[in-house]
Amino acid sequence: NNSVQIEVPQGEYTFRVWCDYVEEGSDSDKYYNTSDFSEIILADRENHSGSNDFRDAFRGSVKATVSAIKNEATVQMRRPMGKFKFISTDLEVFVADAVRKMSDKNQAFDKLLQSINFNDYYVVFRYAAFMPCSFNMFTDKPADSWTNMSFRSMMTIGGENLTTMGFDYIFVNGKETTLSIMLEVYDKDGEKISSTNPINVPIVRSKMTVVKGKFLTSMAS
């Protein structure tokens, strides 16, 4: 919760509010350019910041009458975007393949897992067609899209040997949109070791879509 005091002449108003993350102690834009409420746009097209929870943002509006006495208005903030996350279910197969040249292949899975440096691998997400890049506060809809977009992500190992490959926040037109997304995995030498065909991912405003599959060992046809 946050309160802001402003002075405006008496009258009827619509107050529109945008909220996102910036550097501590700064009021300068970081992830979004917010100078124009008809097109709040991602700040960096060349180095898209995916797999970053600081990309989360909220918007809201309220109509209010301002009179001569003290007035208060409460704005209900909601996300203008949805989130997707890719989780791979084939970690054991991936680990077995990664250590196939080891002399002792009969080690317990936990020991094999410890022998692999997952920082030696990275994931690339590619948007096959387009990616919404800006949002119109007045229409409550995305304003524009970019093509040929991608971002790089690191893998994280979770419970039950599930591997989070990456995630992103996407502006949503209305309640739901669908994007075509491809995923690729590379080793430290830049060699592609797995890839997928385009996957149609439904993205719902203010919700997270989880996509599960064998992304560590698949190869696009």
Model-identified regions with their sequence ranges:
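Tryptophan-paired
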Residues: 1-29, 96-207
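Short, low-hydrophobicity acidic/polar segments
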Residues: 1-83, 87-93
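Generic preference for hydrophobic/aromatic residues in regular secondary structure cores
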Residues: 41-42, 48-63, 151-154, 164-175, ...
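Hydrophobic, glycine-enriched assembly/anchoring segments
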Residues: 203-221
